[in-house]
A protein has these predicted regions:
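Membrane-embedded alpha-helical segments in integral membrane proteins
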Residues: 1-12, 32-36, 117, 148, ...
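Alpha-helical transmembrane segments of integral membrane proteins
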Residues: 107-383
Length: 383
């Protein structure tokens, strides 16, 4: 079968990623132009490590956004004639090259790698955001008030953290568990926290202005109930909000495993920051505890939380890859990176490059997050 040269392979690779390169140029131009107004993110301009990490992360973000433009084939498109072909093999019928070759079912590895980034970037950051909302909602009052509730919550957090994470994930996403109501129950509990946190933020700001507080509460409850019904019960009357049951199962498992760590971090930061002079000044002004937690303590804890969020998304990405490698969670034909590695690892001796696309994608994304976290840590330490 006809193949293109190595130079043509890389030329096609970079050409197909044109929307990504253009988006990266615009993003970094905006970063350098408005760096003085972007806070800690703008400070990354003076951190080469942080810029490299941000470049890698944004590469995959834009790759996921423009996957339909970048990919040459559909992620599930098969061709029995082109199974396990090396990089650069040309599809004679279409005249289109398989940039990184094909897998055992004749699916384009480059296209599946690009579409796989959508799955990772859909689940990992979103689950970490919910985990942070859960950890912040419980960690702020626990660290601020202390008492028996703090003791109970700390014990439960330590209990969850004592489990090996891989074993915990296996127990939560096993096929038998997916068929029960446990994922929906867990998701139902976790998705209550964003609503509770939004209510807490509004109350802390407008507790003495009922003309603003009550309408704001009503809006939050209405929008929250709509999103809640779609995400947890797949019962959105408008049909706009829904999530695949397999993804919901993984989502709930990620939040369950990540929330205790966030809780402990927020609790520790709260116990430290509440002793600062500006918190005492807020108490002297007569500010309530919820105002102090939301508007005095939380903003001053943002540095460690931002750094930890980058590391946590990378950690969750590795866990998702591990689950996919063991065939857990996602559908067997899913183009997520872990499943791709699992599906191609048996043919390394026949086609040594067959596992490289998914492996390098997973490794580079996690590396980018770690470098970005290092850069943010350096800049937050300077502040």
């Amino acid at each position: 079968m006809e193949q293109i040269s190595s130079f043509e392979i890389w030329y096609t690779f970079f050409y197909q990623l044109s929307p990504v390169w253009i988006s990266l140029f615009i993003a970094f131009s905006a970063l350098f132009i408005w760096r003085k107004n972007l806070g800690i993110l703008g400070h990354l301009c003076s951190s080469p490590i942080g810029l490299v990490g941000l470049f890698i992360v944004l590469f995959w973000v834009f790759g996921a956004i423009f996957a339909d433009l970048v990919a040459l084939f559909e992620p599930f498109e098969q061709s029995g004639r082109y199974r396990r072909k090396p990089p650069g093999t040309i599809n004679a019928e279409l005249g289109i090259p398989y940039i990184f070759g094909t897998d055992t079912l004749g699916r384009d590895l480059f296209s599946r790698m690009i579409y796989g980034s959508q799955i990772v970037l859909l689940i990992a950051p979103a689950a970490c955001v919910v985990a942070y909302v859960v950890g912040i909602t419980l960690g702020l009052p626990s660290g601020y008030f202390g008492g028996r509730s703090d003791t109970v919550l700390s014990f439960l957090a330590n209990l969850v953290l004592a489990f090996p994470v891989i074993l915990l994930f296996y127990l939560l996403v096993a096929p038998g568990v997916r068929e029960t109501m446990l994922p929906n129950i867990m998701a139902g509990v976790f998705f209550l926290f964003p609503i509770a946190f939004a209510l807490m933020v509004v109350y802390s700001r407008f507790s003495e202005r009922l003309n603003v507080l009550i309408p704001s509460f009503n809006i939050i409850i209405i929008i929250g109930s709509w999103l809640y019904s779609g995400l947890v019960f797949n019962a959105d009357p408008l049909g706009l909000v829904q999530i695949d049951p397999n993804e919901l199962n993984i989502f709930a498992a990620v939040v369950f495993a990540s929330s205790p760590g966030v809780f402990r971090l927020v609790r520790g930061l709260t116990m430290d920051i509440k002793t600062r002079d500006y918190v005492a000044a807020a108490m002297t002004r007569g500010e309530g505890p919820f105002f102090i937690m939301i508007w005095e303590i939380l903003p001053n804890a943002r540095g460690p939380l931002i750094v930890d969020s980058c590391l946590r998304v990378g950690y969750v990405t590795i866990l998702l890859g591990t689950l996919g490698f063991f065939g857990l969670g996602m559908e067997p034909e899913s183009p997520d990176w872990g499943s791709m590695i699992n599906q191609t690892r048996s043919y390394i001796r026949l086609v040594p490059t067959i596992v490289l696309p998914a492996t390098l994608a997973l490794a580079s994304f996690v590396l980018g997050l770690n470098l970005l976290a290092d850069g943010l840590r350096e800049e937050s330490a300077k502040d």
